[in-house]
From Swiss-Prot:
Gene it is expressed from: lepA
GO cellular component: plasma membrane
Keyword Cell cycle: no
Organism per entry: Ureaplasma parvum serovar 3 (strain ATCC 700970)
Membrane is among the record's keywords: yes
GO BP annotation list: positive regulation of translation
Protein name, UniProt field: Elongation factor 4
Upper classification of the organism: Bacteria, Bacillati, Mycoplasmatota, Mycoplasmoidales, Mycoplasmoidaceae
Length: 599
């Protein structure tokens, strides 16, 4: 096929602006799937994606479209997630395209993640085609949104498609805009040395690891001996093809095409997403510039509530990590919770999705320890170490200073909530940076803020005080030294490692008090008094006491001498002393679940 009839594009938007619905309508309009085969969110392959109405894994399909100019075009559509946690999925799909459709909600207008995805597309030199969706809503105001797109992003909206992905209104306008504005891969040559960009991979129990690739140069065929340029490993192509979104086998993929390649690869760890595939016997001179590797931002320990399921949890993590390149994990143990796994996630939604997948797909209920970020610690001997867990914090005497990650936080909000948002940001140690006017009623607030503060229910608080109207986006900007301390929680004088947290010194007392009070509520009474203490080093900063349960030892004495009663009470007193010295505090698992989930 002539390269001028190929188009590769992706759909980008803020979460919930209608990307997946637009993908459905495009697939339906071009008769790529029959009516019987269509389901809502056809590209969202996981149940959890359909239920939450979000896209987590990117997906790529090939579509044939007969345009108004009487030519047939081969269009590759790559659907991407919109949530800030899954930006790495977006960056990968954009590297495989020449253009992007920017979907903007006709009622809500430009949101925080609309902007961050636009900047990603511009970094990849993509042609951006703005599209205004949901024009069938009573609150839709396409003219206001057009002006926003022109003023804030600087794109021309003279012939912007006005569509309703839900009803299928004007879907052909979007396809015509793609043909008109997205450039074809004219520099792609079928006879050049093979260069294919791996932009995703997933595990198939029959084929092994399947790579989703964009063939930039050359041709790849079944039986070819191929090499991964990052690790120099060689494989033989066993199968390849395209997705429509059904898997369709082919004998070859040519330059400009997007498809999948299977080559009996055992684990996803053997594949670097962003790597280049080339031929072993006639390799390309240099690899394609891959997408940037994004490191985990949030760390958390996962422990099975039923400790006998630890081996099942290890197997579950191995299987999930086969299809999730951003998930990192290592094994760890806790005195309180037993054996577990410490995982690195991209954010709290990513963490929640993994927890839910483990519960659903493998039937393992988990306790999650308090989420933590990576802290950099400068020691008194001038060495610098990084820690992702309070348990790894060195002794206070050996610490010179502690640095924590800061993010640039952008919040877009109706102007009547600006005051409440500023109060929220200041209470979370935010540093005011800028306030921009988006239109007559909306403002964009910029703050510098510690990442750790955003992780603890910041998004929920933001939605609550703005009645759900505000949107946010953040990016890591570096590390900054702060007055941070490790807070240990002790039960009956013994440290409970699973409950330790790192907090700012100014907020340490408040956080400690809350944890102690929660523990007092959930730990059952014992036959001896239990002190619950929070300490920084050797200094106790908060305390609650669980009173002993009273056992009536003199109930059996009817009348008689008072000295008999005194003797029994003295014996009980001695027994309680011994229990307090050697007795273990029995903390039920649901107490950990309750305290850690609310932490």
């Amino acid at each position: 096929m002539d390269k001028k009839f190929i188009r590769n594009f992706s759909i980008i938007a803020h979460i919930d602006h209608g990307k997946s619905t637009l993908s459905d309508r495009i697939i339906e309009f071009t008769n790529t799937l029959s009516k019987r085969e269509m389901t809502n969110q056809i590209l969202d392959s996981m149940d959890i994606e359909r239920e939450r109405g979000i896209t987590i894994k990117l997906n790529a399909v090939q579509i044939k479209y007969h345009a108004k100019d009487k030519h047939e075009y081969l269009i590759h559509l790559i659907d991407t997630p919109g949530h800030v946690d899954f930006t790495y999925e977006v960056s990968r799909s954009l590297a495989a395209c020449e253009g992007a459709i920017l979907v903007v909600d006709a009622a809500q207008g430009i949101e925080a993640q609309t902007l961050s995805n636009v900047y990603l597309a511009l970094e990849n030199n993509l042609e951006i085609v703005p599209t205004i969706n949901k024009i069938d809503l009573p609150s839709a105001d396409p003219n206001r949104v057009k002006k926003e797109i022109e003023d804030v992003i600087g794109l021309d909206t003279a012939d912007v498609p006005l569509i309703s992905a839900k009803t299928g209104l004007n879907i052909q306008d979007v396809l015509e805009a793609i043909i008109k504005h997205v450039p074809p891969p004219l520099d792609a040559k079928d006879d050049a040395k093979l260069q294919a960009l791996i932009f995703d991979s997933f595990y198939d129990s029959y084929k092994g690891v399947v790579c989703l690739v964009r063939v930039k140069q050359g041709t790849i065929k079944v039986g070819d001996k191929i090499r991964m340029m990052a690790n120099n490993k060689d494989y033989i192509v066993s199968e390849l093809g395209i997705r429509t979104p059904k898997i369709v086998n082919k004998t070859e993929l040519v330059a400009g095409e997007v498809g999948w390649v299977a080559a009996a690869i055992k684990t996803v760890k053997d594949i670097n997403v962003g790597d280049t595939i080339t031929h072993t016997n006639n390799p390309a001179d240099k690899p394609l510039p891959g997408y940037k590797k994004i490191l985990p931002m949030v760390y958390c320990g996962l422990y099975p509530i039923d400790t006998s399921q630890y081996d099942d949890l290890k197997e579950a993590m191995a299987k999930i990590s086969l299809s999730d390149a951003a998930l990192t994990y290592e094994y760890e143990t806790s005195q309180a919770l037993g054996f577990g796994i410490r995982c690195g996630f991209l954010g709290l939604l990513h963490m929640d999705v993994i927890r839910e997948r483990i519960a659903r797909e493998f039937n393992i209920e988990l306790i999650l320890t308090a989420p933590s970020v990576i802290y950099k610690i400068e020691l008194t001997n001038n060495q610098e170490i990084s820690i992702d867990s309070p348990a790894k914090m060195p002794e206070p005497t050996s610490i010179k200073l502690i640095k924590e990650p800061f993010v640039k936080l952008a919040i877009i909000t109706p102007d009547n909530y600006v005051g409440a948002i500023m109060e929220l940001c200041q209470s979370r140690r935010g540093i005011y940076d800028d306030l921009e006017v988006i239109d007559g009623t909306r403002r964009k607030l910029i703050y510098k803020m510690p990442l750790a503060e955003i992780m603890y229910s910041f998004f929920d608080s933001l939605k609550s005080i703005t009645k759900g109207y505000a949107t946010m986006d953040y990016e890591l900007i570096g590390y900054q030294a702060e007055k941070l301390v490790k807070i240990d929680i002790m039960l009956n004088g013994n440290k409970v490692d699973a409950l330790s947290i790192i907090a700012h010194r100014d907020f340490a007392y408040g956080k400690s008090k809350i944890i102690c009070e929660r523990l007092k509520e959930v730990i059952p009474k014992h036959q001896f008094e239990i002190p619950i203490q929070a300490s920084i080093g050797s200094k106790i900063i908060a305390r609650e006491t669980i009173k002993a349960v009273r056992k009536d030892v003199i109930a059996k004495c009817y009348g008689g001498d008072v000295s008999r009663k005194k003797k029994l009470l003295e014996q009980q007193k001695e027994g309680k002393k011994r229990l307090k010295a050697i007795g273990n505090v029995d903390v039920p698992q649901d107490a950990f679940v309750k305290v850690l989930s609310e932490n």
